[in-house]
């Protein structure tokens, strides 16, 4: 199955607007399955043993390429703790999901598989978007859901503009105008 078909399948399965999901993938990667980006300052790591956020990182750990001694890795496949550390701090595949978010969504496989399997990428992105919808839609609408996809939570400036309005506008003009209207820079 190709990416477009996978997006159609999983957006329907998770009751998400297909155009919105497609627009997110267009903005994140231009629909490239092989998109990959290092995010070395990312600090919200996931503990795969407790299935909870990993402890707060100190400043040297945030910039380190090596995992702290107590950072666990999945036992389901062979990878070092350092590989897991780096993988959680990268965004993967057509939806550019952070490795830590993939672990939070209970993805247990090797991260590069997200860049090779459209169904896998679409399934986890739609699962994550549906979770964000369930948390934020009533109060913030689709703009808040998409803002949270990009930055973790929907955040606004004191004058009521989303802090990542530029991202929201890109998603809107990429095919989600129906869901993201009346935004301003």
Placement of each model-derived feature along the sequence:
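N-terminal export signals and maturation junctions of secreted/periplasmic proteins
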Residues: 1-13, 31-33, 39-55
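General N-terminal targeting signals
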Residues: 37-38, 48, 114, 162
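Non-catalytic cell-wall polysaccharide-engagement segments
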Residues: 1-14, 55-185
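Catalytic phosphate/metal-binding cores of nucleic-acid and nucleotide-processing enzymes, i.e., regions
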Residues: 23
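Short, solvent-exposed loop/turn elements at domain surfaces
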Residues: 33-35, 105-106
């Amino acid at each position: 199955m190709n990416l477009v078909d996978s997006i159609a399948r999983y957006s329907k399965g998770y009751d998400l607007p297909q155009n919105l999901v497609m627009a997110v993938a267009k903005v994140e990667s231009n629909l490239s399955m092989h998109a990959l980006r290092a995010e070395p300052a990312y600090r919200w790591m996931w503990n795969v043993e407790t299935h909870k956020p990993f402890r707060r990182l100190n400043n040297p750990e945030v910039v380190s390429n090596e995992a702290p001694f107590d950072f666990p890795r999945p036992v389901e496949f062979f990878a070092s703790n350092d590989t897991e550390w780096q993988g959680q701090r990268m965004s993967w595949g057509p939806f550019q999901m952070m490795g830590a978010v993939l672990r939070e969504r209970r993805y247990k496989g090797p991260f590069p598989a997200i860049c090779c399997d459209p169904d896998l990428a679409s399934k986890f992105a739609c699962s994550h978007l549906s979770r964000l919808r369930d948390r934020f839609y009533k109060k913030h609408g689709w703009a808040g859901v998409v803002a949270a996809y990009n930055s973790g939570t929907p955040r606004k400036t004191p004058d009521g503009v989303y802090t990542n309005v530029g991202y929201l506008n890109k998603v809107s003009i990429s095919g989600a105008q129906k869901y993201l209207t009346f935004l301003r820079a």
